[in-house]
Amino acid sequence: MPFVVMITGIPGVGKSTITRLALKRTAINFRLVNFGDLMFEEAVKQGLVKHRDEMRKLDPMVQKQLQLRAAQRIVEIARDEPVLLDTHATIRTPMGYLLGFPKEVIETIRPNFIVIIEATPSEILGRRLRDLKRDRDVETEEQIQRHQDLNRAAAISYAMHSDALIKIIENHEDKGLEEAVNELVQVLNLAVREYD
């Protein structure tokens, strides 16, 4: 049975770092798939964008088509190996927040777990300000908290349509990255039973 763990969190929460470190410690090899990368590859192929950060400004219907194509590719990959799906539950666009996984997309992927990485708005804002590699929108701490709240609500909706379990992992400056990584490893190691 395919085993897919979705890992999500708003930009600057530390999701990529936690994911990278956890994958070095799992009992089984996971294929790390970035949902945005799959969408970006398809968008470039169609001549829609040149830079990844332009995707969130595409027409929502175009984004949904890209999402569905990416979901189909994930299902193909998960037939052969467990997938850790690095993604965003919601995407802030100029028109409002877009669900990262409309109903037909989440029903296609059917993840086993949805892991949400969270931190305080001030921690996220500080991390964003230190990350000069990305062209991120500027948000206030209140907007950051709203985005995290929307991610939780989206995860509940996704779980309703996929029977996934939800795990929230906190990545606070004082808690330590190590603890967050260990929590993710525990979830990922559940895949061992599926691929033995």
Curated annotation (Swiss-Prot):
Location in or out of the cell: Cytoplasm
Signal sequence residues: none
Transmembrane domains' residue ranges: none
One Pfam family, short name: AAA_17
This enzyme's EC code(s): 2.7.4.3
Binding residue positions for ATP: G9, I10, P11, G12, V13, G14, K15, S16, T17
KW Transferase (keyword) present: yes
Database matches in InterPro entries: Adenylate_kinase_AdkA, P-loop_NTPase
EC top class named in words: transferase
GO MF term set: adenylate kinase activity; ATP binding
Cellular component annotations (GO), alphabetically ordered: cytoplasm
Keyword Nucleotide-binding included in the entry's annotation: yes
Domain of life according to the entry: Archaea
NCBIfam families: PRK04040.1
Similarity annotation: Belongs to the archaeal adenylate kinase family.
HAMAP family: Adenylate_kinase_AdkA
Name of the molecule in the record: Adenylate kinase
Species for this entry: Thermococcus gammatolerans (strain DSM 15229 / JCM 11827 / EJ3)
